[in-house]
Amino acid sequence: MALGTLFLALAAGLSTASPPNILLIFADDLGYGDLGSYGHPSSTTPNLDQLAEGGLRFTDFYVPVSLCTPSRAALLTGRLPVRSGMYPGVLGPSSQGGLPLEEVTLAEVLAARGYLTGMAGKWHLGVGPEGAFLPPHQGFHRFLGIPYSHDQGPCQNLTCFPPDIPCKGGCDQGLVPIPLLANLTVEAQPPWLPGLEARYVSFSRDLMADAQRQGRPFFLYYASHHTHYPQFSGQSFTKRSGRGPFGDSLMELDGAVGALMTTVGDLGLLEETLVIFTADNGPELMRMSNGGCSGLLRCGKGTTFEGGVREPALVYWPGHITPGVTHELASSLDLLPTLAALTGAPLPNVTLDGVDISPLLLGTGKSPRKSVFFYPPYPDEIHGVFAVRNGKYKAHFFTQGSAHSDTTSDPACHAANRLTAHEPPLLYDLSQDPGENYNVLESIEGVSPEALQALKHIQLLKAQYDAAMTFGPSQIAKGEDPALQICCQPSCTPHPVCCHCPGSQS
């Protein structure tokens, strides 16, 4: 048997004999430069750093859109959010739309393979009438979490750090307090934020233990609210990080990762559990020291520059994945087809934008991904993709700043930088210039034939991609209905402030 055939046979046997448990940890508004393993000098992230040391650390891992709702849709479906209608912007508490039920999620793929599926944390893919778009209707057997960002409701009277440090800012006004849901039932409204991460960890432990008792593999999607603004943490992490509220929030996220890994170890499942860590988009730089760090990369959340779309990513599976660092291209879109391959689950009968990178993970080959296409948070079919990376080169056909990346020293990041077309496109060699500082088409040494050929190829890729892409009907354009806001006391008055059932401080 040829060596390549042997590797394929081993991978096939792995996917059918004993599919691994899957722990997918998704951080919120975390920058490329925020973790210790990615070079931050003062972050306290020992558990994540341990995953990086014992697993595969990606240097070139991307999300297709640098905003919460579309990025989460891409992660769970393996499809660009313009296909599923998850644009423009984000869904809110009153949104009538959501992730269409005909979209096939990673949870549905794995549930059909026999997995016990659960989600803890931030959903942000719609609520809908009677909770029609919530996780229990999208393939998750169990759900404990908040259906959108925790700043999408008034927070001026909430405690973010114990014993009584209030949340910074006022968050969104005129809405119901944020609800914590257990499946489709309101558990607390609003929940005690300093105790929220601990509740998620407890929920996750129970799910993993129950799956083992049932003799089933588990899929846990742990979508932490950390490090989204306003930051919060429990007593064990408050004022402990040395990096202020953001650092405390990040430290609690790291602590949760440690607690989850301890549970996996206590259950004797370390070599049977594939752990993936990444984040939805780059840092919200407008928050300054409370907004995270994109490291060497340009701009952050809301932009198609590297700081908005390149994310830390770690994959850990002892005995199966050799520790190291990879510079291969990969995307959050790739997780669904990759996990389907590793578990022996059939792919959904839809157009997927992700590719199977299991050969890269298992050390039997390279990533088949050669290009990454980036849409802005507010896309349209006229402009199509704003930027394309192919190999080491990235071209920006359009750029646009974002309020999320205000306050930086780079005006290209700011909301005041309106939509700008570039002809010829801006072209960067990311192998030498990951910060996108030097347009190679303006090099004082002249433009190399290689760069010109790369530009020509990327221009062709964009033209072909835009021509082939069909935007799905926008779910966000369906508008809002305040009656859809979740309320623990639906007929109470005065609405929405009467929707107040805080529960216990635990």
Swiss-Prot record:
Binding-site residues for substrate, renumbered to this chain: K122, S149, H228, K301
Segment forming the signal sequence: 1-17
EC top class named in words: hydrolase
Subcellular location(s) per record: Endoplasmic reticulum; Lysosome
GO MF: arylsulfatase activity; calcium ion binding; cerebroside-sulfatase activity; sulfuric ester hydrolase activity
A GO CC term assigned to this protein in UniProt: endosome
EC numbers for this chain: 3.1.6.8
Cofactor: Ca(2+)
3-oxoalanine (Cys) sites (modified residues): C68
Cofactor detail note: Binds 1 Ca(2+) ion per subunit.
InterPro entries: Alkaline_phosphatase_core_sf, Sulfatase, Sulfatase_CS, Sulfatase_N
Biological processes annotated in GO: autophagy; binding of sperm to zona pellucida; lipid metabolic process; response to estrogen; response to ethanol; response to methylmercury; response to nutrient; response to pH
Record's keyword terms, sorted: Calcium, Disulfide bond, Endoplasmic reticulum, Glycoprotein, Hydrolase, Lipid metabolism, Lysosome, Metal-binding, Signal
Pfam families in UniProt: Sulfatase, Sulfatase_C
Active-site annotation: C68, H124
Post-translational events: The conversion to 3-oxoalanine (also known as C-formylglycine, FGly), of a serine or cysteine residue in prokaryotes and of a cysteine residue in eukaryotes, is critical for catalytic activity. This post-translational modification is severely defective in multiple sulfatase deficiency (MSD).
Main location per the UniProt record: endoplasmic reticulum
Cystine pairs: C155-C171, C160-C167, C299-C413, C487-C499, C488-C501, C492-C498
Record: glycosylation sites: N157, N183, N349
Binding, Ca(2+): D28, D29, C68, D280, N281
Subunit structure: Homodimer at neutral pH and homooctamer at acidic pH. Exists both as a single chain of 58 kDa (component A) or as a chain of 50 kDa (component B) linked by disulfide bond(s) to a 7 kDa chain (component C). Interacts with SUMF1.
Protein purpose: Hydrolyzes cerebroside sulfate.
Family, as annotated: Belongs to the sulfatase family.
Official protein name in the record: Arylsulfatase A
Provenance organism: Mus musculus
